[in-house]
Amino acid sequence: MKLLTRAGSFSRFYSLKVAPKVKATAAPAGAPPQPQDLEFTKLPNGLVIASLENYSPVSRIGLFIKAGSRYEDFSNLGTTHLLRLTSSLTTKGASSFKITRGIEAVGGKLSVTATRENMAYTVECLRGDVDILMEFLLNVTTAPEFRRWEVADLQPQLKIDKAVAFQNPQTHVIENLHAAAYRNALANPLYCPDYRIGKVTSEELHYFVQNHFTSARMALIGLGVSHPVLKQVAEQFLNMRGGLGLSGAKANYRGGEIREQNGDSLVHAAFVAESAVAGSAEANAFSVLQHVLGAGPHVKRGSNTTSHLHQAVAKATQQPFDVSAFNASYSDSGLFGIYTISQATAAGDVIKAAYNQVKTIAQGNLSNTDVQAAKNKLKAGYLMSVESSECFLEEVGSQALVAGSYMPPSTVLQQIDSVANADIINAAKKFVSGQKSMAASGNLGHTPFVDEL
């Protein structure tokens, strides 16, 4: 496969085969080409391949893997955080310098992101250079070496990465919220615990990759590439680890509370209960409920005064605040509730007023106008998100890992429209009656404990 000189091959990667050129379909001459339909293939080993030839000047390929932090255990916490930083380390087929310089030379980009469920390795570049980036993507995900000295050099970056992320109090509160809500799996942090920084070893990285980066846990998604060629690459180079890998533990919701007292004048608080599994009809009801209550301002720098939560809290305090509904769905659980930011002295009034507003809906006080407006906001938000190629790639990859298929936007909109008022009221009732979890940070002298709510 071509490198900087356009004359290299995959001979160093796996010496048995030479990778085909990953070229996009040539655009027809004359009239502007029309994007093709999304093509989906599931190989016998469980690997899912999907592609959309949209004739964009930029090609994007993502390898999505069921290997998020939920698959760690108490002995290897922080492994996925370090994995996110190792994409430029030496592999069996390319040195660290070769990867970095090769991507840089063509103006490409290799990024690694992770959620509690999945990891995603994504490359993007001009469509004529996609074969170069594909080689590096395959090297990084299938043939890492994790040399001890290179891994050791990355350890301080864990601390910096975490410190930068935690400059936003919301990041820390959401991390604490999951730790309070679950006993295992989804309780695992996205960022390496402080006591593990400097202790994550190359052996732990190898073990995690060997047992979770298997074909049946992967989905290869491409935009602006040919499906037959992408399928050929997957069959040749992503078929080296069969089986399902290590199965992860089912998330066990318990309910709990984590309070972090500090000197901040603003109190950040998240107050939730267990909701619904991603992709279920009940999860759709919680999504509509989120937009009934208020999921954030729809006018840039707007005051969000049309939000039901905002209106309720505004009657309880004259001090500045922010409030929105919180909603997170996973493959075997979910969290729904309220996120508030307030002055320390008003924290109790803000949280209680927001909670009482959800109780009002649980009692059946819900108009058809509010429901239709919420559905419109939810549908518009979804459609606008998948207009972005980055978000579309992520959406297809996530669906491929969960269901092995793709649900088109038209079907998603139909499911949103099918949510009845009674479904939304039942979702509110489930939150009100459910075992609560809470995380808060700031000057918490006026912040109620979870059992006081």
Curated annotation (Swiss-Prot):
The keyword Electron transport applies. The keyword Acetylation applies. InterPro entries: Metalloenz_LuxS/M16, MPP/UQCRC_Complex, Pept_M16_N, Pept_M16_Zn_BS, Peptidase_M16_C. Residues 1-14 form a transit peptide. The modification N6-acetyllysine is found at K66, K199, K250. It holds the Pfam family Peptidase_M16. GO terms for cellular component: mitochondrial inner membrane; mitochondrion; nucleoplasm; respiratory chain complex III. Its main location: mitochondrion. It comes from the Eukaryota. Component of the ubiquinol-cytochrome c oxidoreductase, a multisubunit transmembrane complex that is part of the mitochondrial electron transport chain which drives oxidative phosphorylation. Component of the ubiquinol-cytochrome c oxidoreductase (cytochrome b-c1 complex, complex III, CIII), a multisubunit enzyme composed of 11 subunits. The complex is composed of 3 respiratory subunits cytochrome b, cytochrome c1 and Rieske protein UQCRFS1, 2 core protein subunits UQCRC1/QCR1 and UQCRC2/QCR2, and 6 low-molecular weight protein subunits UQCRH/QCR6, UQCRB/QCR7, UQCRQ/QCR8, UQCR10/QCR9, UQCR11/QCR10 and subunit 9, the cleavage product of Rieske protein UQCRFS1. It is linked to Mitochondrial complex III deficiency, nuclear type 5: A disorder of the mitochondrial respiratory chain resulting in a highly variable phenotype depending on which tissues are affected. Clinical features include mitochondrial encephalopathy, psychomotor retardation, ataxia, severe failure to thrive, liver dysfunction, renal tubulopathy, muscle weakness and exercise intolerance. Belongs to the peptidase M16 family. UQCRC2/QCR2 subfamily. This is Cytochrome b-c1 complex subunit 2, mitochondrial. It comes from Homo sapiens. The gene is UQCRC2.
